[in-house]
Amino acid sequence: MKFTRTLVLASTSLLATVATSQAQEVKRDTKKQGEVVLKPITIISHGKDNIEATGGTVLTYKDIEKLQPANVSELFSRQSSIAVSGGGGPSKRIHVLGMEQSNLAVSVDGVPQTATSWHHTGSNVIDPAFLKRVEVEAGAAAADSGFGAAAGAIRYETVNALDLLEPGKTFGARIIGSYGTNGRGFSGSTAAYGLKDGFDWLLMLHGTSGHNYKNGDGTEILGTEPAARNILGKAGYEFDGNRIDIGYERSRDKADRLIKMNMGLPGDTEYPLEVARDSVNIKYTRTDATDMWDPEVQFYYNRNDYWRNDYQNRTNGNMILKEDLYGGKLQNTFTIDYGKITAGIDFGKHDYNTDNYGHNDRRYRKFNTQQVGAFTQGRFEFDNGFSLSTGARYDYSRFADWNDEVFSDSGASVNGTLSYKFNEHIEVFAGASRTWLGYVLGDYGYVHARNNAFYTDPTFSPGRARNYKAGVNFGGADWSAGITLFDTRIAGLPNYDSQKLGNDPEEYRSRGFTLNARYIWNYTTIGATFTKAKVTAGDDPVLPNSGSFMPIGDMATLFIDQEIPDYNMKVGATLAWAGRISDEAATAANFYDQPAYTVVNAYAEWNPPAVKNMTLRVGVENLFNENYYERTSFAPSQNRGGIDAVWAPGRTFTFQTAFKF
């Protein structure tokens, strides 16, 4: 497509090569109005990994405020390396470089999250209304990122009272209301927060109510109505150099959905479905940490439920899944001359409960996994231009299946990333990791559809992963550019055939490169990203069947933000493009070619001078009403009498008013 060549060549010729820094934080010099300076490029900064400098993604609170995302598709709309499939909220699946997020260590406020339970549901995600920061560490993840980081890590961080309070105030509140066309309906968010005598607290509520949306051709897409009912509560207390944080998150989505939310089947109808998530955590840290004593202690409990218990034909769709995940982490960070070393232990137990259908006398199944690990990660900056992030962990994993058969094993993981900075403008880096994954259960929802004789293969073994990356960063006071090459391989994943749970014999692989760039001039920011990835199972391209590994081909984004201080206004736009995908393996499996698409989103925001605490915003998604399905969606095919994609929304306007007190 001509647009592809134009976008890539324009980005390359403008900036020579593209940046790893997808969302560089910007600091304005208050002495010189309008002057903007980007952070220096380096993989290590003040003892912390710079995720962006090695091809990852960081979304700051300012980035999220600009986007005002209604869902995770909009949250990652400016990142070509991250694809989100369409449909209603519970059906959205997040893929990083073509790998579903269950292949990464996902956490919310440091709390590990459960993997995707069923291949027809979406990824477990946090409500974007609660977020203040997102980090996506693609590829070789640090040892303290958590257990099972096969393809990297995703870290979501939610807001607290200290983030929202105005300077000098001890109480605040925020109210946001919006209405959207094309089924988006009404959305409301309220928050109250305060600070008194070392105690800070926050309570935030968010709800949505709408209808099924229509695609670009005007066809109603069943099962897509917004129906979120979410709560975030936090409290913190500081005393004598100690800090204790307690958090609770509650998520509910209850609406009529398709029986298989990620695909359209002939004669599809909707059925009641409820997806629920509860998370509680408590964390201890020090506010007066020293070089040798900077502890962090955290304990957590997660509950995930999936209820579809009144489907008309029990042998084909009645389904109840329940998961409980609880554990903790104890670590300390040591500061030395050239950096920091973090060491600790983490542990967790994951309980699974499923109902069953079919001709068997076992109505329910229960099984579990357990993990205990020790880790250390060092991050160093040396005077000679070298920086190093390296670490290791050792884990014990245990799996007890539904027949009370027990499997146990242990293994080591190592990682390292080395960089050399020639000067303040050029840095090269290379990194690698080998990760032991323990017993991976993956898409355990298959167990729901197996008879009483289903068992675990006695040779079932732990999974493993390898990651390699290398690249170059360039940067100046107002621009950044770079390229990252990546290669991720994952093996030993589960295979639920008709008789037993065993290991998938295939090695899954994602390899390619990412290009990203950013230029800032006064109040204007322009950015671009490009990702090219080849995703395979063994020697063959993966099929576009909404699985854990999906073909993404070529994807690109281009965005611009403009502040207009004289009028208290901000405007911006995002263009997302995906190239056509056609391969013989998909054709042989009766899939149609995936067409290219180009989607444009835009927004305008205004703070009325007479009401300084009010913000008015209008946004439009899919400005030109493109009829498309998002990359990593289940692609149309001739199978089962004709499978259709869950098409993305057509043109949608959103009108928002926000008050902050």
UniProtKB/Swiss-Prot annotation:
Residue ranges annotated for the TBDR plug domain, each copy included: 48-159
Location of this chain's protein in the cell: Cell outer membrane
InterPro entries in the record: Plug_dom, Plug_dom_sf, TonB-dep_rcpt-like, TonB-dep_rcpt_b-brl, TonB_rcpt_b-brl_sf
TBDR beta-barrel domain: residues covered: 170-661
GO cellular component: cell outer membrane
Family affiliation: Belongs to the TonB-dependent receptor family.
Protein name: Heme transporter BhuA
